[in-house]
Every structure is written in C-alpha cells, then in structure tokens.
Amino acid sequence: MSEATTTLDGWYCLHDLRSIDWAAWKTLSSDERGQAVSEFLNVVEKWNDVAAAKKGSHAMYTVVGQKADIMLMILRPTMEELNEIETELNKTTLAEYMVPAYSYVSVVELSNYLPADEDPYQNPQILARLYPELPKANHICFYPMDKRRQGDDNWYMLPMEERKKMMYSHSKIGRQYAGKVRQVISGSVGFDDFEWGVTLFADDVLQFKKLIYEMRFDEVSARYGEFGTFFVGNILPDEKVEKFLHI
C-alpha cells in the first residue's frame, strides 16, 4: 500500500454561496429592506470582531454569472462555530430572500514535508498559512478538485517520493505568481464531495486564468487532476452591501 501524506490542519472553512430572490426582495418596502440589511450587517460586524481578535477570518464577494449572487468564505477554529454562523445567518430576514446555491466544507491544509524533529506548529510562516487572515483582494476564484483514481492514472497508488517530486514541480508554478495570486488550500476528504477546495485571491482577475492554464500543462493537473465547478467574483465591502441590495 502506498504511504499516505501527513497533513497539517488549521481553521475549518465554509464556502456559502447564495442567490438572491430579487422578485421576492422587491415586494418589501424600502424600510423593511433597510432593516433586513442592517440586521445582516450586524451579523457581519460580529465576524469583524472575531477577525480583529484573530480568532477567525472571513471574505464576502459577489459572484459573476448565474451560479450564485454572493459568496461567503468563513474560517473558524471549530466545525461547531461554522454551523452556528450558518444557523444565525439563516435566521435573518435577508436569508428569507436568499436561495442556497452551493456550499463547501473543508479545513485549511498543508502537506507536512518538514524534518521529523521540527514542530511545524512553532513555525510562524506555517501558522500564518494554517490560520490565515483572508486578503481584501478585488477578486476571488473558488473550485473543488480531486486527484484521479483511474487505471494507471491513480494518484494514490504512486510512491510517496514520486508524489513529492511532482508536487514540488507543481508548486513551483504557483510560486511564480507570488504577489499576484494568494492561494488557500483546504482539505475536504470526508467533509464534502471533493478532496480539496482551492481558493484564489487576486487584484487582477486575469491572473486566475493565467495561473490555472499554466498549471494544466503540469503532470499533476494534466494527468491526475479532476475539477469541479468554478466560481469567480468581485469583492463586496461591508459599506457596499446596502448598494448591492438596493432596489
């Protein structure tokens, strides 16, 4: 049996994507919509307090296309906290005018290739990646993915050293986009329908296309990658939520 990779796990992650029922939203009076927006922003303010205390992080983006209208990415120390956040949001008035579009549950993950005598949880660089402060980049791209398990193209039957070598080559492409694209990898085996979630942040949305296209030619993606639905969006600052929901 091939050897399993040891992973380092950080904050739990929820991607919550929803569509707005604009027709129903329009039936509310201006005052009712205003109250609903204020209630939602009060919930977001709680998230801001958690982020300020460095006990979690979140991001809020509008989604381009018909797949959804809004994407929330929430990071917390426990799965219970993610559930509480989702439940609190579902109890708001605004949620009555939202339709669930997609969700993804995972945990921020890094592969542990450090020397056995080094404690990765004492390494500041690793801690910053396991418990990240999500950037306020202009754009987001999220997609789930698997490693292929078909015939001779079975990632999980490859020897550990071969997988390490290929992943090192794969990661070199990503490092070429340092400063242009910020990446958060989250593991989801046993949590959701795919094995990983990939979240990319960039101020220049075209960098998503360039990075992902270049990686397609790397063996890890070309031979072993299986990809789910892609979602791309634009940042939604707190101060622009009211404008976004204005009728």
Curated annotation (Swiss-Prot):
Note on cofactor: Fe-coproporphyrin III acts both as a substrate and a redox cofactor.
Keyword flag Zinc-finger: no
The protein's name: Coproheme decarboxylase
Pathway terms, separated by semicolons: Porphyrin-containing compound metabolism; protoheme biosynthesis
EC number(s) from the headed UniProt entry: 1.3.98.5
Top-level lineage group: Bacteria
One term of GO molecular function: heme binding
Family: Belongs to the ChdC family. Type 1 subfamily.
Described function: Involved in coproporphyrin-dependent heme b biosynthesis. Catalyzes the decarboxylation of Fe-coproporphyrin III (coproheme) to heme b (protoheme IX), the last step of the pathway. The reaction occurs in a stepwise manner with a three-propionate intermediate.
Catalytic residues identified in the record: 143
Cofactor (UniProt): Fe-coproporphyrin III
Membrane spanning residue stretches: none
Keywords in alphabetical order: Heme, Heme biosynthesis, Iron, Metal-binding, Oxidoreductase
Coiled coil regions, renumbered to chain: none
GO biological-process terms attached to the record: heme B biosynthetic process
Positions that bind Fe-coproporphyrin III: 129, 143-147, 170, 183, 221
Cited PANTHER family: COPROHEME DECARBOXYLASE, HEME-DEPENDENT PEROXIDASE YWFI-RELATED
Reactions this protein catalyses: Fe-coproporphyrin III + 2 H2O2 + 2 H(+) = heme b + 2 CO2 + 4 H2O; Fe-coproporphyrin III + H2O2 + H(+) = harderoheme III + CO2 + 2 H2O; harderoheme III + H2O2 + H(+) = heme b + CO2 + 2 H2O
EC top class named in words: oxidoreductase
